[in-house]
Structures are given as C-alpha cells and as structure tokens.
C-alpha cells in the first residue's frame, strides 16, 4: 500500500507516474507478489482514498471495469503499462506484473488530488454467499458491491 497527495496540475500523468514508481518499488523490494491485482483509490480525503483503493483491489472481480468509460480506459492503460515494465512473476523478468487494475473515484477538494495504490495477491481466494432465513445458501459469483448508489452515480 502506498499513498501520495498529488497536485491537481499533475493530472492523469501524475497518476501514471505514481503508479509506475510504486509498482517498481513494490516489485523490487518484494512488497507485492506478482502477478498482483492492483487497486487505485482517487479523490476524497486520505481515509476515503485508502478505503476506495483497498475495495477496488479486494472486492472487484478480475476483468471488471469501472462504468465510467474514461476510468475504464485508464484501468486498461495502467494494466498494460504495469505489464510492460519487464518484471514478472516473483520479480523475475517477464510481462505479468499486473493481473488486473481497478480504480475507484470519489469527489475531492480542488486543492489536492489524493491517490492510493494497493496490490492484492493473485493467490487470494474469496467467496460470497447469501444466507436465507429458511437455511438455504445461495452462492454469488459476482456480489456487485459497487452499486450505482455506492458510486454516487446519481449525484450530479
């Protein structure tokens, strides 16, 4: 996990630079086990930013994309950038540093742009089920934690 407060003028290039710097540091120092699922939180305050990044890494399904087309495009671009660094599984050379990249965004003050990055180990396992009152258990392959309400898509 890493966090940085960027200047608003850093824009998308600042996010990309932070992503590559952090990923390279994680890979060289053995702080992430590759291939990793990367979660990026952007906006809010520090607490919100960190929470969004962790949720993006841990709760979203691999292959899922943000409903905002610009964010989805950035997720794909960051994944490709991460895999083109020349680092692969266990820090050995290769093109498999990032299994997937997810980004969640929150509203923030214009004076700063908080960004956090979290690497979630590919070997992690999870399951989700809904338990009913009659004792029936229903497995949920995609629990849809990120609803339009949760993402505040209805806020204009």
Residue spans of the language-model regions?
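Non-transmembrane, aqueous-exposed alpha-helical and coiled segments at domain scale
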Residues: 1-40, 44-156
């Amino acid at each position: 996990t890493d966090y940085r407060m960027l200047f608003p003028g850093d824009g998308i290039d600042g996010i990309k630079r932070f992503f590559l710097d952090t990923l390279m540091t994680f890979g060289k120092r053995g702080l992430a086990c590759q291939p990793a699922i990367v979660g990026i939180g952007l906006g809010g305050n520090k607490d919100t930013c960190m929470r969004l990044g962790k949720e993006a890494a841990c709760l979203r399904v691999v292959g899922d994309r943000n409903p905002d087309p610009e964010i989805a495009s950035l997720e794909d671009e960051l994944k490709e950038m991460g895999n083109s660094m020349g680092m692969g599984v266990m820090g050995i050379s290769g093109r498999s540093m990032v299994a997937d990249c997810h980004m969640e965004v929150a509203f923030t003050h214009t004076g700063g742009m908080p960004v956090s990055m979290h690497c979630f180990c590919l070997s992690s396992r999870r399951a989700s089920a809904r338990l009913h009152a009659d004792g029936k258990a229903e497995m949920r392959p995609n629990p849809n934690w990120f609803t339009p309400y949760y993402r505040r898509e209805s806020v204009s």
